[in-house]
């Protein structure tokens, strides 16, 4: 009995039903609930697993490099980045007939291949890689790092190398090491790589291990650094006629503030990027020396937080008690980390397309669309996870005595006001936005488009103008050519910025109108409603008017019977579950908006977006239906084409998505009866009755069925849109 899964829970291991398997999987990572767990073992297990995570990441990235070097066309892509399609890897599929082989043999390959829409070619090219040998070297190095990480993980599980709890809770040392060591030193090292390898490569000079000690990154070497004439490093930048990867039109500057984009590659100037990383390195190296460790100087986090008591008295005891609450709660720390990471991931999505850092990536439209969508979805899952762990913190780790009258306690005390205000904002946004869309729909349907309600986003246009966009005619700040801000800026900073903002061939400050105004508010509705559900779930996790003792039931309970006026669907888990649907819905609107706006921009028919995006039928007909034609046409009487795989994935995604509803809209009794019937039939059928269950089959619990349904819904939803996005974009701009 002792060796049955799950080893971490004797109670579950002895369960005679299939519940043993499902609950075992569900609680495998909930270390806190495992048998014989101590605080020390909890911290040590998590710490060791981080090394495993790093090993997987290094192995994965190593695999990317290896497969491109082995099966890709990196060297021929480097010769002509705009016209050669980058190959991710070869496809070996015994089912392929001749038409399929022909359809997927692309990019100069000898057999069927996958095209890379991840941007890795552009990235590797920008940072100075040029040959397959470079890629193999990188793959081997990352494989080595992966092995080192695995060894480190194993090592930190050995008794002699297990860190103590006090080491894990030493906040100041961890801050110093992460700020200086992780961010500071790595940013400085990256600046070094850009200056010593990437910038010379962009000027046609190859710097490798055999010559990097002989090649000066700047004609004057370290002279200007030691004499304080740092401005010399910014003089003689690459000219606007510079051909990337060659010496033609190249300069000698290494750290600049040019602003705008390299005219040929449409990406940020590499010398600007190096300068940025140097500044980041400086800030973080300083920040990593601010906290008090063994030397008795610097800040103590506890003293800092305890001193944060606003004098007006309107925030009570301010941050008193927060240090211990955060430092003793892994869920609090994880929640904060996920919230920050989620926001950063969304910012990455926004900045990768508007300020592209990699050479030629802005002209690879499918990659731009794929990267934006990918990062927004990742951000959504990470952000909802932040609230999930926030709710678990409130249930498991929050101590009311420790936090009396501080900001955390006051949040919980006036939660009704927070929830009702969020609710009001969501209702207001929803009804007004839908009202405008539907009104416009009706006007179009009745043939009177001039009666639409079209609102210009004047405040957003004013902000764009203040930053230098002249087309709206606001004549304010940087868009006012006679103003002091404009004149001062010409000589000091970012001369290329104003050109970039006012050029229509990039995605920086796109021209916006009534369609943007409407979809902006639709997205605002989605964001506020998602937030409402998540915030309510966390704030009510310990108890609500209906169920004051909710915290005793844990994070994910389905119901507490029929009493109390109905206690089903009110656990913190239920809030998370509902919020994920809203999150997916919202990101759907975000990505639809981004994609349609950009397709019309790239095709040169922005008027289609401007005219059709002001009413719902326009979105359904001119975006979704019009752009799914390639997918619906993936297989036709003329045989297959290179979009067929996406057509199949589009169908398959819908299937997975629809399967989710089977778990989401059903009664447990039905499933139990179905399972009993299947088991009965199996046991009475020759051959099938040779296989016997050791566990009695039981239906999934309510919470489990919802999780399975949600997983199918999410995966199907994202698969379907990914296929739509890639096929419709690559079909137009192949």
Swiss-Prot record:
Its main location: plastid. GO terms for molecular function: 4 iron, 4 sulfur cluster binding; chlorophyll binding; electron transfer activity; magnesium ion binding; oxidoreductase activity. It is a multi-pass membrane protein. Chlorophyll a B3 binds at residues 662, 670. It is found in: Plastid, Chloroplast thylakoid membrane. The chain crosses the membrane at residues 46-69, 135-158, 175-199, 273-291, 330-353, 369-395, 417-439, 517-535, 575-596, 643-665, 707-727. SUPFAM superfamilies: Photosystem I subunits PsaA/PsaB (SSF81558). Keywords: 4Fe-4S, Chlorophyll, Chloroplast, Chromophore, Electron transport, Iron, Iron-sulfur, Magnesium, Membrane, Metal-binding, Oxidoreductase, Photosynthesis, Photosystem I, Plastid, Thylakoid, Transmembrane, Transmembrane helix, Transport. InterPro entries: PSI_PsaA/B (IPR001280), PSI_PsaA/B_CS (IPR020586), PSI_PsaA/B_sf (IPR036408), PSI_PsaB (IPR006244). Chlorophyll a B1 binds at residue 654. PROSITE patterns: PHOTOSYSTEM_I_PSAAB. P700 is a chlorophyll a/chlorophyll a' dimer, A0 is one or more chlorophyll a, A1 is one or both phylloquinones and FX is a shared 4Fe-4S iron-sulfur center. [4Fe-4S] cluster binds at residues 559, 568. GO terms for biological process: photosynthesis. Phylloquinone binds at residue 671. HAMAP family: PSI_PsaB. PsaA and PsaB bind P700, the primary electron donor of photosystem I (PSI), as well as the electron acceptors A0, A1 and FX. PSI is a plastocyanin-ferredoxin oxidoreductase, converting photonic excitation into a charge separation, which transfers an electron from the donor P700 chlorophyll pair to the spectroscopically characterized acceptors A0, A1, FX, FA and FB in turn. Oxidized P700 is reduced on the lumenal side of the thylakoid membrane by plastocyanin. Belongs to the PsaA/PsaB family. The PsaA/B heterodimer binds the P700 chlorophyll special pair and subsequent electron acceptors. PSI consists of a core antenna complex that captures photons, and an electron transfer chain that converts photonic excitation into a charge separation. The eukaryotic PSI reaction center is composed of at least 11 subunits. NCBIfam families: psaB. This is Photosystem I P700 chlorophyll a apoprotein A2. It comes from Atropa belladonna (Belladonna).
């Amino acid at each position: 009995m002792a060796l049955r899964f799950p080893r971490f829970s004797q109670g579950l291991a002895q369960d005679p039903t299939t519940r043993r398997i499902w609950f075992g999987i569900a609680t495998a990572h909930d270390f806190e609930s495992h048998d014989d767990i101590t605080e020390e073992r909890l911290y040590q297990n998590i710490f060791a697993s981080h090394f495993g995570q790093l090993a997987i990441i290094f192995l994965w990235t190593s695999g990317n490099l290896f497969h491109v070097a082995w099966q890709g066309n990196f060297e021929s892509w480097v010769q002509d980045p705009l016209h050669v399609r980058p190959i991710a890897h070869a496809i070996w599929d015994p089912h392929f007939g001749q038409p399929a082989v022909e359809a997927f043999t692309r990019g100069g390959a000898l057999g069927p291949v996958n095209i890379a829409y991840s941007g890795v070619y552009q990235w590797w090219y920008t940072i100075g890689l040029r040959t397959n040998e470079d890629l193999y070297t990188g793959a081997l190095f990352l494989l080595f790092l992966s092995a080192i990480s695995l060894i480190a993980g194993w090592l930190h599980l050995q008794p002699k190398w297990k860190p103590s709890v006090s080491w894990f809770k030493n906040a100041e040392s961890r801050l110093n090491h992460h700020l200086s060591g992780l961010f500071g030193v790595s940013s400085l090292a990256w600046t070094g790589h850009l200056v010593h390898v990437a910038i010379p490569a962009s000027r046609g000079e190859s710097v490798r291990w055999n010559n990097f000690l002989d090649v000066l990154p700047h004609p004057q070497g370290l002279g200007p650094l030691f004499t304080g004439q740092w401005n010399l490093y910014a003089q003689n930048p690459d000219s606007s006629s510079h051909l990337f990867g060659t010496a033609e039109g190249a300069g000698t500057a290494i750290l600049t503030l040019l602003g705008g984009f390299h005219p040929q590659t449409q990406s940020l100037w590499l010398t600007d990027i190096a300068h940025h990383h140097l500044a980041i390195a400086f800030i973080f190296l300083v920040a990593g020396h601010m906290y008090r460790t063994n030397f008795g100087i610097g800040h103590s986090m506890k003293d800092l937080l305890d001193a944060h008591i606003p004098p007006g008295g309107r925030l009570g005891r301010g941050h008193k008690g927060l240090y211990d609450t955060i430092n003793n709660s892994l869920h609090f720390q994880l929640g904060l980390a996920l919230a920050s990471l989620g926001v950063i991931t969304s910012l990455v999505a926004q900045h990768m397309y508007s300020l592209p850092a990699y050479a030629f990536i802005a002209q690879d439209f499918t990659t731009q669309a794929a990267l934006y969508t990918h990062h927004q979805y990742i951000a959504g899952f990470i952000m909802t996870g932040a609230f999930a762990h926030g709710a678990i913190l409130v249930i498991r780790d929050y101590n009311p005595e420790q936090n009396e009258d501080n900001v955390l306690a006051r949040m919980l005390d006036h939660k009704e006001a927070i929830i009702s205000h969020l609710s009001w904002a969501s209702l207001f946004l929803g009804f007004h936005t839908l009202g405008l869309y539907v009104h416009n729909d009706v006007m179009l349907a009745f043939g009177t488009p001039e009666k639409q309600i079209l609102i210009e986003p004047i405040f957003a246009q004013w902000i764009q103008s203040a930053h230098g966009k002249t087309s709206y005619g606001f004549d304010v700040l940087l868009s006012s050519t006679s103003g002091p801000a404009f004149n001062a800026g010409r000589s000091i900073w970012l001369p290329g910025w104003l050109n970039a903002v006012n050029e229509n061939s990039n995605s920086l400050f796109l021209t916006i109108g009534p369609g943007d105004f409407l979809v902006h508010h639709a997205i605002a509705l989605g964001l506020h409603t998602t937030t409402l559900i998540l915030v309510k779930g966390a704030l009510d996790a310990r108890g609500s008017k209906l169920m004051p003792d909710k915290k005793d039931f844990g994070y994910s309970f389905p119901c507490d019977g029929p009493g109390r006026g109905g206690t089903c669907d009110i656990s913190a888990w239920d809030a998370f579950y509902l919020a994920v649907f809203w999150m997916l819905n919202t990101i759907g609107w975000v990505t639809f908006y981004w994609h349609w706006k950009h397709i019309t921009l790239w095709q040169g028919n922005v008027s289609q977006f401007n005219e059709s995006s002001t009413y719902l039928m326009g979105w359904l007909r001119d975006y979704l239906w019009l752009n799914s034609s390639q997918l619906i046409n993936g297989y036709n009487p003329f045989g297959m084409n290179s979009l067929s795989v996406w057509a199949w994935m589009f169908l398959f995604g819908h299937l997975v998505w629809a399967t989710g509803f089977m778990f989401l809209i059903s009664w447990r009794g039905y499933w139990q009866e179905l399972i009993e019937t299947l088991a009965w039939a199996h046991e009475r059928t020759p051959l099938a009755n040779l296989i016997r269950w050791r566990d009695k089959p039981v239906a999934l619990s309510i919470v489990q069925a919802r999780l399975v349904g949600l997983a199918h819904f999410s995966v199907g939803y994202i698969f379907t849109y990914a296929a739509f996005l890639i096929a419709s974009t690559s079909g137009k701009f192949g």
